[in-house]
Amino acid sequence: MRRLLLAVVGGLVLALALAACGGADDSGGPATRASGDEPAPLRMGTKNFPEAVLLGELYSQALQAKGVRVVLKPNVGSSEIIHEALTGGALDIYPEYIGVLLSEVANDRSRPSDPRAAYRAADAFEERQGFTLLGMTPFSDSNAIAVTPRFAREHGIRTIADLGRVPGRVRIGAPPEFATRFEGLVGLRQRYGLRNLRTTPLMIGRQYRALDSGRVDAAAVFTTDGQLSGKRYVLLEDPRGVFGTQHVAPVVSRKALRDHGPQLAATADAVSRRLTARAMRRMNAEVVLEGREPRAVADEFLRRAKLK
């Protein structure tokens, strides 16, 4: 109950914050017709980590190239928070990870292993809420647990279950919501019986530095992280399926679809089709490791793909 209350209060506070900090083209309230038959700007949010911000830039820039006015609101928050902003009318659309949508928003722990089955379940949930899932990406940025090669060798670790054999506590660097999510500490304890795990709250992106320094023993990561391009880290296998399929699909309000016509879905789907795992890992590396702006990285990708 406490978690639910915190999520609701957080969502309400967020909605007020979004309304207060809207751009010049955004009233912050429910979308209305701007003038005559011209639809109001599409209010797009993103979750609060680099890949999510990059996705927002990709979708928003492609839509703007087609004449859709977009107000991009990056770093809104976790799935629980940003979905509350969507249902509360502060946003019209945002890119979401299907597995997280099912487990943390829809509270569906069935964990379909087939991406198409997961998509159908997520779409059915959103339709009941008055929203629609657009086409999903080829890439799946699944959650995973990473350790250093040295730690893996010292303890003979290959799978998540092997963490149970590590003497003493295993410190996992992860974002704060990891401690209360099924795709996190809750699922790891339920599916693997791991009682020796302790979380160290870290901002997304800082877990690799914590691994390198020895501050943590393991880290919650995303499989398209640019840091995983080399062999500096070992991803532990997840045979019991705590971390589900994480293809991305924009969640959009039906009103926005009506207001902006078929070009909204067609343009977003065209972007999604180009987002392979290789493309995302490369762009993530440019943003996180090379320090480039997500806006510039997205612009280059869209121009190469002839989507801008």
What positions do the PLM features span?
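Ligand-binding "clamshell"
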Residues: V105-S113, Y119-L134, S213-R215, Q227-G241
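Bacterial signal peptide processing site
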Residues: G22-D25
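C-terminal motif of bacterial Sec signal peptides marking the signal peptidase cleavage site
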Residues: A17-A20
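Bacterial N-terminal signal peptides that target proteins for export
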Residues: M1-G10
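An extracytoplasmic/periplasmic, membrane-proximal ligand-sensing/linker region
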Residues: E177-A179, E183, R189-L194, Q263-K308
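A bilobed periplasmic-binding-protein/Venus flytrap-type ligand-binding module shared by bacterial periplasmic
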Residues: N143-R153, H247-H260
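Bilobed "Venus flytrap"/periplasmic-binding protein-like clamshell domains
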Residues: P39-V71, P138-R209, S213, R292-A296
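Paired acidic/hydrophobic, glycine-rich loop segments that form the ligand-binding mouth/hinge
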Residues: D92-E96, V216-F222
